Amino acid sequence: MTPNTSPGSTLPRAQVLAERAFSTLEKFLHIEAFSGVVLLLAAAAALIWANSPYADGYHHFWHTAVSFSIGSWSVSESLHFLINDGLMTIFFLVVGMEIRREIHEGALANMRLAALPLAAALGGVVVPALIYFILNPGGEAAHGWAVPTATDIAFAVGVLALLGRSIPSNVRVFLLALAIIDDIVAVLIIAVFYSGGMDYSGFIIAAVGILMVLGMQRIGIASAYPYVIPGAVLWFGLLKTGAHPTLAGVVLGLMTPVFAPHARTHPLELASKALKDLWNQTANSTPDPHHLAHPLKQLRRAQRDLLPPVSRVQMALHPYVAFGIMPLFALANAGVSLDGIDMSATGSMSVMLGVLIALVAGKPLGIIGASFLMVRMGWCALPPGVTWGGVCLVGLLAGIGFTMSIFIATLAFNDPNLLGAAKLGILLASLSAAVLGLAWGFFQAKRKQPAVA
């Protein structure tokens, strides 16, 4: 050991290196574009896996049963179900909270602004359905008219994230609001046209969950953890109705308070006292960990009380959603097998082209057209910072139908050839919409950059 090296000096150096490593990791985790890259890599891995010699392993893995039991009660669901209907509820919770914040003080703060995503979403449903029906007017092929009406919100947001900070935040909010409305319309279409109806008793259970949330908010429960219980009740109620249970996340997100809870002691005063206690404790060369615990706890409480719940929970969940849940969702759902698709079968080509054209051209036409009409008539206004170029970007990205479109296709077609053709059309359309959206987004960002002399 050299004279300048001692255990005491080695520890601070190791601590500095660790802090730098965690700081670098934290920067990566908060780069929007990096989360988009991770999502696309997961999707590419799934697509390659599903079309490799190990394709059977891919499908068997995601359909592995996961069981949970207490005494005589037990439940068993596939891994695929737990991701799509369980973990994705957290994704929709974050989306719902982002929209809640914007309704309070942002891009959706008044009716003229909030009505635009609704009109755009309806245009993005009607026009693709009409285009598909024109190309497939009869027979079983006509049953797939709803396939191109859907938008895969997770992939659309993931591709938008690749554009990073170059795109105004209100464009993202517009896309989120539109995609959620699109999702709700898709659920209604499935319930009315592709199922035996809804079990309305589930709405009573869902209502109980909502009332539990309102009651807990009323008595001032600030911690997020207790709300898991009424959230689970709401989720189960929606599952029982036949609707997509992940919508429970949207409902909870929209119910999240936008104001910090009223505390007896002002959070800044509490934080100041806690920091003073910490300073006094760490003045000793060897502070007692037991004495540090209380001021650290008070500091965390001050942080909790200072931030509105909608911001606090969203910030806490964002890294887990962006780098955990969304890549898992992509890995579990992007594995579309192209093996055995017979495009020479009757109706296959028209189904594939109908889906492809309706998603790539119909979605943007419907969204841009409805938005232009509403703004031109004076019924709506573009959100602050959103130009017509931004509306075009949202229209293009909304053409990423992917998982929701595939789900509707499996309900619409009994013929395996038509189903295979629809899946191929969805895959080609989603890839095309993503590429066109990225190209248009980079073009828009470049136009904003000042010319270098």
Curated annotation (Swiss-Prot):
PANTHER family xref list: NA(+)_H(+) ANTIPORTER NHAA, SODIUM ION/PROTON ANTIPORTER NHAA-RELATED
Keywords assigned: Antiport, Cell inner membrane, Cell membrane, Ion transport, Membrane, Sodium, Sodium transport, Transmembrane, Transmembrane helix, Transport
Database matches in InterPro entries: Na/H_antiporter_dom_sf, NhaA
Alphabetized GO MF terms: sodium:proton antiporter activity
Domain of life: Bacteria
Main location class: membrane
Ranges annotated as spanning the membrane: 28-48, 79-99, 115-135, 144-164, 173-193, 196-216, 241-261, 321-341, 355-375, 393-413, 424-444
Span of the signal peptide: none
Protein's recorded name: Na(+)/H(+) antiporter NhaA
UniProt key word Transcription regulation: no
Annotated localization: Cell inner membrane
The keyword Secreted is assigned to this record: no
Catalytic reactions on record: Na(+)(in) + 2 H(+)(out) = Na(+)(out) + 2 H(+)(in)
GO biological process entries: regulation of pH
Annotated GO CC locations: plasma membrane
Gene3D superfamilies: Na+/H+ antiporter like domain
General function of this protein: Na(+)/H(+) antiporter that extrudes sodium in exchange for external protons.
Membrane topology value: Multi-pass membrane protein
Family: Belongs to the NhaA Na(+)/H(+) (TC 2.A.33) antiporter family.
Lineage of the organism: Bacteria, Pseudomonadati, Pseudomonadota, Betaproteobacteria, Burkholderiales
Pfam families per the UniProt record, alphabetical: Na_H_antiport_1
